[in-house]
From Swiss-Prot:
CDD domains: CBS_pair_IMPDH, IMPDH. Pfam families: IMPDH. Residues 168-224 form the CBS domain. InterPro entries: Aldolase_TIM (IPR013785), CBS_dom_sf (IPR046342), IMP_DH (IPR005990), IMP_DH/GMP_Rdtase_CS (IPR015875), IMP_DH_GMPRt (IPR001093). Its main location: cytoplasm. Pathway: Purine metabolism; XMP biosynthesis via de novo pathway; XMP from IMP: step 1/1. This is Inosine-5'-monophosphate dehydrogenase. NCBIfam families: IMP_dehydrog (TIGR01302). The lineage of its organism: Eukaryota, Viridiplantae, Streptophyta, Embryophyta, Tracheophyta.
Length: 502
């Protein structure tokens, strides 16, 4: 790859563009095309989340309670990315979410409910969010599996007063916890069975049904390897705060096998976070810690000196975040990513561009401006794997999506992210909303990644590292888009249209 600046001066270098005193968002800037001598499919998107943790694809699910729990964590890991499980639950519950995601090697997680054979199912709520209920001798996890009841079978059961043991299906064939989809499907075909129980250390951890296997097998296939640790388990991250009781939370997470922790704060350049970084690195030196959030080089340098292994960049740029409006503090995300990356790379600290991602073009911009990964909230909210139930709003199928700075989220515990003390007056820095049903991340993320590859091809970058090299060697050029240019760059001039990306 040629990193010689073009002989004809055209556009601006990032250094010049971002030194003019303006705070730019992703939509404000546009990259100029460069020379192509490779196919889009040849673009290598492998990267690092932290100093020591590699990822096959540069995508991270945000630690929000309407985005990242067990299902999202297992799905993102299977795609080659990673999810950071939120901390808006008690420490033991968060550790259970981490354990659940790591207890299988398929992106299917039903989180089954349990019942004893003598139990009577009176309401569909007894199934929780699972499509079936496991029947064990003790009516809880850890007991002997006697059978299972599918929700649809219970719905069709005329006499709801019958005991579970009277109509449950027999226990299905078992498979090891780390069996892949092909192995599970093979067992189902050979046994003519509609379900397979996943077993680990003699205990059934989940039940996989044929409908789910066929659904997932029908999604696009990625060549990227899954994000798996040395122990063969999915890699999963988790968020934590900077208070004294978060040290106890950290113990639970480490015991659950967490691979990386994110110190979750809206303003990371604080004595509280600096001390927590040093504590984590001294007590658990093998555990990588990501600091943030930051938007300036000064903030970043302080956390780098404290020993962080990664930096989370963004303040007030999320779609549900009102920090810039309420507190008058923050920075345009494009400027923040470039500025922080320009100092972090000198220390070998990867940058996570957190917030402001609405489309694949924003991911291309974030990565090309120096970030190693893009963290997404609203982009993944509303998906099949996001927590919460679908509801209908004005005829549209939606899921709740809320900022961790919203009063609703802070009431559940996320105020630690925004308050350094126990202030009684809580000021919202986020809102509660809804996003439409997006389907499964296993379906739309592969298309998103292909769009990112095509964007990299257009700027002449055959890999994420080469994009960074082109940026820093002044080959990659940008311009600022006027309001009219932004309108022109989108769909315009039509009476009506249908926008489909894949």
């Amino acid at each position: 790859m040629d990193f010689t600046p073009p002989p004809i001066e055209d556009g601006f270098t990032a250094e010049k563009l971002f030194s003019q005193g303006f705070s730019y968002t992703y939509d404000d800037v546009i990259f100029l095309p460069h020379y192509i001598d490779f196919a889009a499919d040849a673009v290598d998107l492998s990267t690092r989340l932290t100093r020591r943790l590699p990822l096959a694809v540069p995508l991270v699910a945000s630690p929000m309670d309407t985005v990242s729990e067990s299902a999202m964590a297992s799905a993102m890991a299977s795609l080659g990315g990673i999810a950071i499980v939120h901390s808006n639950v008690p420490a033991a519950a968060q550790a259970s979410l981490v354990r659940a995601a790591k207890s299988r090697r398929v992106p299917i997680l039903s989180e089954p409910a349990f019942a004893a054979p003598s139990a009577v199912i009176e309401h569909e709520d007894d199934f929780a969010a699972s499509p079936f209920l496991l029947v064990t001798d003790i009516g809880a996890a850890g007991g002997k599996l006697l059978g299972y009841v599918a929700k649809r079978d219970w719905t069709n059961q005329k006499d709801k007063s019958l005991r579970v043991g009277d109509y449950m299906a027999p226990p299905p064939r078992r498979a090891p916890w780390n069996a892949d989809l092909n192995k599970i499907h093979e067992i189902m075909e050979n046994e003519k069975s509609g379900a397979v129980a996943l077993e680990r250390d003699g205990e059934v951890v989940d039940l996989v049904v044929r409908e789910e296997v066929e659904r997932v097998k029908g999604y696009p296939k990625l060549a990227a390897p899954a994000t798996v640790g040395p122990d063969g388990e999915f890699m999963v991250g988790a968020a934590m705060g900077t208070r004294e009781d978060d040290k106890e939370r950290l113990k639970h997470l480490v015991k659950a096998g967490v691979n990386v922790v994110v110190l979750d704060s809206s303003q990371g350049n604080s004595i509280y976070q600096l001390e927590m970084v040093k504590y984590v690195k001294s007590v658990y030196p093998e555990l990588d810690v990501i600091g943030g959030n930051v938007v300036t080089m000064y903030q970043a340098e302080n956390l780098i000196q404290a020993g962080v292994d990664g930096l989370r960049v963004g303040m007030g740029s999320g779609s549900i975040c009102t920090t810039q409006e309420v507190c008058a503090v923050g920075r345009g995300q494009a400027t923040a990513v470039y500025k922080v990356s320009s100092i972090a790379y000198k220390s070998g600290v990867p940058v996570i561009a957190d917030g402001g991602i609405s489309n694949s073009g924003h991911i291309v911009k974030a990565l090309s401006l120096g970030a190693s990964t893009a963290m997404m909230g609203s982009f993944l909210a509303g998906s099949h794997e996001a927590p919460g139930a679908y509801v209908y709003q004005n005829g549209q199928r939606v899921k709740k999506y809320r900022g961790m700075g919203s009063l609703e989220a802070m009431t559940k515990g996320s105020d630690a992210r925004y308050l350094g003390d126990t202030a009684k007056l809580k000021i919202a820095q986020g809102v509660v909303g809804a996003v439409k049903d997006k389907g499964s991340v296993l379906n739309f993320i592969p298309y998103t990644l292909q769009a990112v590859r095509q964007g990299f091809q257009d700027i002449g970058a055959s890999s994420l590292q080469s994009a960074h090299d082109l940026l820093r060697s002044r080959v990659l050029r940008l311009e600022v888009r006027t309001g009219a240019a932004q309108v022109e760059g989108g769909v315009h001039g039509l009476v009506s249209y249908e926008k489909k990306y894949y």
